[in-house]
Amino acid sequence: MTIYLLLAASGFIAWIISTIGGGGGAMLLVPLVGFVAGAQAVAPVTTLATLVAASGRAFVFRRDVEWRVVGWALPGAAIGGLLGAAAFSSTSAEWLQIIVGLFLISTVLQYRLGARKRTFEISLWWFFPAELLVGFLSGLVGAMGPVMNNLYLNAGIVKERMVGTKTAVSLPMHMVQLGTYSALGSMNGKLFLFGAAAGVGALASNWLARRFLREMRARDFRAIVICFMALSGIVMIWGQRAVIVAHF
């Protein structure tokens, strides 16, 4: 019972932070899930937790969705998520996490800690290939952190619109991933309970997090998002420190 309460409390805190930071709640759960269930359980457990939490977030932010972005991003995310989850049991993704971590850290320099609104101009169709890649990587490791935030910031989508739009894209993707994990035998009853516990805790945080977000200035939001991206990158690289040490 203690483990389930710890997962629920961690989910609650992680999703408040991730809402204010533009996503990446599952990333904060990775160390705990890896400790209680093992590294191989991280992807299916965090996917279920994200799915449960995102259902509440989708309701809370339902009026803030940029549907033009969803039209491009959702197909890519669903296809990528399916392919990544299918390859989950037979693919090693350690170096991918290190590369993504370095990219996330670099955003601090790109945006000058939120002082710059954009670093490059984008077109909406970019969301399809970007979500295809991120969906695939998410299927492999379960949590990619706020990787897509760079694209959203450059599209001028911030605060509630970023959270609402990202949720509308990620919710179906995580449904596809969870179904694939279950079909391939990567999700069992115990892992389901772990994911559900973290997800229920996260679900309760959505309303409180939205109140914080409403009162935040756009520039402050950008600065927090960028700092959280860098922190997520550090966490990803730290999680693969054994791989780096072994290589050198």
Model region roles, listed by residue range:
Residues 4, 47, 100-104, 108, ...:
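Residues within membrane-spanning alpha-helices of integral membrane proteins
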Residues 4-72, 130-135, 143-206:
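Small-residue-rich hydrophobic segments that form or flank transmembrane alpha-helices
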Residues 30, 85-94, 119, 181-193, ...:
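Membrane-interface helix termini and inter-helical loops of multi-pass transporters
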Residues 54-64, 85, 99-123, 207-211, ...:
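Transmembrane helix exit motif
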Residues 63-68, 115-122, 155-160, 213-220:
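Membrane-interface helix-boundary motifs at transmembrane edges
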Residues 67-72, 90-104, 215, 219-223, ...:
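Loop-to-transmembrane alpha-helix entry segments
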Residues 78-84, 199-209:
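Transmembrane alpha-helices of Major Facilitator/SLC transporters
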Residues 206-230:
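Interfacial loop-to-transmembrane junctions
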